[in-house]
Swiss-Prot record:
It comes from the Eukaryota. Belongs to the glycosyl hydrolase 5 (cellulase A) family. PANTHER family: ENDO-BETA-1,4-GLUCANASE A, ENDO-BETA-1,4-GLUCANASE B. It holds the Pfam family Cellulase. This is Probable endo-beta-1,4-glucanase B. Coiled coil: none annotated. The gene is eglB. GO terms for biological process: cellulose catabolic process. Keywords: Carbohydrate metabolism, Cellulose degradation, Glycoprotein, Glycosidase, Hydrolase, Polysaccharide degradation, Secreted, Signal. The keyword Signal applies. The keyword Acyltransferase does not apply.
């Protein structure tokens, strides 16, 4: 969970055709992946489909380049399914929206780093819980087909399922996996997410059945999110304590080990203050001590419309870019 606010800034450039498999950029970091979410194309979710440049925006490629130069090697690119396929989950694409999304993805992978496609829909489509796994499988077969030749693309099944039947969450994730592989996208990682906003601190209580997911390519990564404020929602600059980061990922770490799985913290953040800096460092240090199961983490969030949002990692003036990057720097490549 996280708070979202809208501000205006520049957009990414025009699209080009999806590239062939890219060479991965070489780097030196304790983690396989460390990076940021790139927010904007999911904004204005109460005004769908909305107007590009008014209700939503695409990430600024030059800002992403700055973060790559700082050592980041993975970017989770948010979008709304209703804008990509406005008629139905199995329907035709809005070609302009797809083109803009593809432009950002290509810019990231052309730099030799990973781009995550994140349908930021919370397990819903047009406000209704997605209850038909076969339609979701078709959605993912179609979308993965657009990027199946690009090995640096990662498919994130859906952002933060919540308040849903647990078996349905499992089945939707499995349907996504099946659709992606059916499309011929066999080299790419798939990030799966759980119920209860995919929280690491509630994972073992809520999402134990997710261990039953199957992928013929064995490239599933369990994506969890973790914020450090009192309710774990990511809506406050305050962190509970300097140790709360490590505390909230400990049980999930053991679950990954017990079930021989690997995971990533797909969203995390803390306020620009000493206690949160200590808590963030403590969590990342703990993840770094357990890289057999934790493959990295992504900050929430960069994006051109964040303005003075408390967690903004957008160069050059984002609150976290100027105030938290020194903490993150130790883990960057």
């Amino acid at each position: 969970m996280k708070f979202r606010n809208l501000f205006f800034a520049a957009v990414a450039g025009s699209a080009v055709a999806a590239p062939l498999a890219k060479e991965q950029k070489k780097r030196d970091s304790v983690f396989q992946w460390i990076g940021a979410n790139e927010s904007g194309a999911e904004f204005g979710e109460n005004n769908l489909p909305g107007v590009w440049g008014t209700d939503y925006i695409f990430p600024d490629v030059s800002a992403i380049t700055t973060l790559i130069d700082k050592g980041m090697n993975i970017f989770r690119i948010q979008f709304k399914m209703e804008r990509l396929v406005p008629d139905s989950m199995t329907g035709a694409y809005d070609e302009a929206y797809l083109q803009n999304l593809t432009t950002v993805v290509n810019a990231v992978t052309d730099a030799g780093v990973h781009a995550i496609l994140d349908p930021h829909n919370y397990g819903r489509f047009n406000g209704e819980i997605m209850s038909t796994p076969s339609d979701f499988q078709t959605f993912w077969k179609n979308l993965a087909g657009q990027f199946q030749s690009n090995s640096l693309v990662i498919f994130d099944t859906n952002n933060e399922y919540h308040d849903m039947d647990q078996e349905l969450v499992l089945n939707l994730n499995q349907a996504a996996i099946d659709g992606i592989r059916e499309a011929g996208a066999t080299e790419q990682y798939i990030f799966v997410e759980g119920n209860s906003y995919t929280g690491a601190w509630t994972w073992t209580d809520v999402n134990d059945n997710m261990k039953n997911l199957e992928d013929p390519q064995d490239k599933i990564v369990y994506q969890m999110h973790q914020y450090l404020d009192s309710d774990g929602s990511g809506t406050s600059e305050t962190c509970v304590s300097g140790t709360i980061g490590q505390e909230r990922v400990t049980s999930a770490t053991q679950w990954l080990k017990d079930n021989k799985k690997v995971g990533i913290i797909g969203e995390f953040a803390g306020g620009n203050n000493d206690q949160c800096k200590t808590a963030v460092k403590g969590m990342l240090d703990y993840l770094a001590e357990n890289t057999d199961v934790w493959k990295g983490a992504l900050w929430w969030a960069a994006g051109p419309w964040w303005g003075d949002y408390m967690y903004s990692l957008e160069p050059p003036n984002g609150v976290a870019f100027t105030g938290m990057l020194d903490v993150l720097q130790a883990y960057l490549g």
